């Protein structure tokens, strides 16, 4: 896999109350590029964070409709990847 693509696949970890509860089950969420596949996401997490990935689930989050100065607009769609790592391994999202 192209090294540059690996570095650009993961955009940021998602830190929320729901994701904090899921981290007890070895699941973590990341905002990823829209054109990333599950194989690319798995490879990027394993290379960059040094953990073994068991499963990757992806979903598209639709952008919200917003009104700004009387005009209707929308925020862009984005892709979320939920990654399950092997038992006993953790990802420190504060460090990433």
From Swiss-Prot:
Coiled coil: none annotated. InterPro entries: Nucleotide-bd_a/b_plait_sf, Ribosomal_uL23-like, Ribosomal_uL23/eL15/eS24_sf. Pfam families: Ribosomal_L23. One of its GO terms (molecular function) is rRNA binding. Keywords: Ribonucleoprotein, Ribosomal protein, RNA-binding, rRNA-binding. The keyword Ribonucleoprotein applies. One of its GO terms (biological process) is translation. GO terms for cellular component: ribonucleoprotein complex; ribosome. Belongs to the universal ribosomal protein uL23 family. Part of the 50S ribosomal subunit. Contacts protein L29, and trigger factor when it is bound to the ribosome. One of the early assembly proteins it binds 23S rRNA. One of the proteins that surrounds the polypeptide exit tunnel on the outside of the ribosome. Forms the main docking site for trigger factor binding to the ribosome. PANTHER family: 60S RIBOSOMAL PROTEIN L23A. This is Large ribosomal subunit protein uL23.
């Amino acid at each position: 896999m192209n090294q540059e693509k690996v570095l650009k696949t993961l955009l940021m970890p998602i830190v929320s109350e729901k994701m904090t509860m899921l981290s007890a089950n070895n699941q973590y969420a990341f905002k990823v590029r829209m054109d990333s596949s599950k194989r690319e996401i798995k490879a990027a997490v394993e290379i960059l964070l040094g953990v073994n990935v068991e499963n990757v689930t992806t979903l598209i989050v639709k952008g919200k409709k917003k009104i700004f100065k009387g005009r209707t607009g929308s925020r862009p769609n984005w892709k979320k990847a939920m990654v399950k790592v092997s038992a006993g391994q953790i990802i420190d999202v504060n460090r990433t």
